Regions:
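Intrinsically disordered, low-complexity terminal regions
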Residues: 1-300
Length: 300
């Protein structure tokens, strides 16, 4: 107990006095517990769960609150899920582990999982990982790295360096500022914000990117999908060196792109598989690619 107090951790054990919540629903047994951490400044938070969603929300104050919702077919199975929590200064690690061999319960089709619901100061460094489950984050500024083996990622009202990765699932980013790197093996991508660096890829899915009015490129952008359409909306005054290509589809361009290819005067569009040229004053490269699908470039 003394060591826990030294690092500022309050762990709630599963006893009536500790306030641990135990319940039962159609998804089996549920046990909820909390862990609290006090920090001076921006925390460096590492979250890991083997299976389960992760939800993070930025709040005022200097505390990190991690609520852990453990589920399983029986109370014994839930109790075997181990929560490891440590703190060293601003560095906080919380990991939920399942036993090496899970219990088999005949007649109950419920596997074990552990969902994390986290309140964190608005300025933070975060690494959140789940083997299977969605991740949501809202209202946080800093380096934010979110990874899931199978599940969607939703991001809103964030600022900083964003790294998003899912093996199978959609990615949605709303009202973001900073640098963005994202990848999904299979899923659609929808992004809106004021981003200076953009690197997006999906193996199979459409991409929609809406750049805010103040958007300016600080480095080359890469936007690609193996199979799906790409739609990009750019503000007035935006400048880039465009390199767009589709393996099977057409490019519909409504921007003023300076090229050596004459404009189709009848339609006011350029319908082709490759389009290269300057947008505005040119500058950093904007590379847009799809293996199979159309590309649409429009003013916002």
């Amino acid at each position: 107990m003394r060591s826990a107090l030294r690092v500022g951790i309050v762990a709630l054990a599963c006893t009536p006095l500790a306030g641990c919540v135990v319940g039962v629903d159609s998804q089996g047994q549920i046990v909820r517990e909390e862990k609290r951490f006090s920090v001076d400044g921006a925390p460096d938070l590492r979250l890991t769960t083997f299976d389960g969603a992760i939800e993070l929300r930025g709040t005022d104050g200097g505390q990190v609150l991690v609520e852990i919702e453990k589920r399983g077919p029986t109370r014994e199975a839930v109790d075997e899920l181990k929560v490891e929590a440590t703190q060293e200064g601003r560095r906080i690690d919380v990991e939920v582990k399942r036993p090496a061999r899970e219990r088999m319960v005949f007649g109950i089709n419920v596997s074990t999982s552990a969902k994390l619901i986290v309140s964190v100061p608005r300025h933070a460094t975060i690494l959140a990982r789940t083997g299977d489950g969605g991740i949501r984050i809202e209202g946080v500024e800093g380096r934010l790295e979110l990874r899931t083996g199978d599940g969607s990622i939703h991001v809103s009202d964030v600022k900083g360096e964003l790294v998003l990765n899912t093996g199978d699932g959609s990615i949605n980013v709303d009202r973001a500022e900073g640098r963005l790197t994202l990848e999904t093996g299979d899923g659609g991508v929808n992004v809106e914000g004021n981003l200076t660096v953009v690197r997006m890829h999906t193996g199979d899915g459409s991409i929609v990117y809406r750049a805010d009015s103040a958007t300016r490129m600080e480095d080359d952008w890469e936007i690609s999908t193996g199979d799906g359409s790409v739609s990009i909306y750019l503000p007035a005054g935006f400048s880039a060196e465009l390199d767009a290509h589709t393996g099977d589809g057409r490019i519909r361009n409504e921007l003023d792109v300076a090229t050596n290819i004459e404009r189709d005067r009848d339609s006011g569009e350029r319908d082709r598989r490759t389009l290269r040229g300057k947008i505005g004053e040119g500058g950093k490269r904007l590379r847009v690619q799809t293996g199979d699908g159309g590309i649409t470039l429009r003013a916002r």
